[in-house]
Amino acid sequence: MTIEVSNESGIDVSEEELISVARFVIGKMDVNPAAELSMLLLDTAAMADLHMRWMDLPGPTDVMSFPMDELEPGGRPDAPEPGPSMLGDIVLCPEFAAKQAADAGHTLGQELALLTVHGVLHLLGYDHAEPDEEKEMFALQRELLEEWVADQVQAYHQDRQSQKDQRLLDKSRYFDELNHGDTP
């Protein structure tokens, strides 16, 4: 799976985190591992221009998705076997997202993770124009985001444990060297 991120927003964000959440969602949705995704981060002026050009709506927005191929998520019972493809582009506006994050009481990173999940789901054909579609998409979005966060927490704890184990191992080697008369 190839995920490219281009940050033209002027705001420092964790590209690794964006790639991580996108890769997680794409994997959970059974998209072919050879799929490609492009993510672009823009400032509010560039996002407002894109929003007007493609959606005919004034002002910036948080996320826009531009699917390249007609795809259905592989996890859906009515979906055909997934094949390699270009999923499309997700465009994020960190400056706009920062305002939303502050209003929601969480970090910009958390907001961008949410918007990345939202953008990937749009690329896979999910929408929220109708109430039943919104209910389905937002429930799936919440579930995927919670699973990704849990996965990140578990990885963090495993990494911390590995660091502790390595320190103990290093100490035991030091004591082994002392007991055998070797100098460290």
From Swiss-Prot:
It comes from Mycolicibacterium vanbaalenii (strain DSM 7251 / JCM 13017 / BCRC 16820 / KCTC 9966 / NRRL B-24157 / PYR-1) (Mycobacterium vanbaalenii). Binds 1 zinc ion. Its EC number is 3.1.-.-. One of its GO terms (cellular component) is cytoplasm. This is Endoribonuclease YbeY. Residues 156-184 are annotated as: Disordered. Its main location: cytoplasm. InterPro entries: MetalPrtase_cat_dom_sf_prd, YbeY, YbeY_CS.
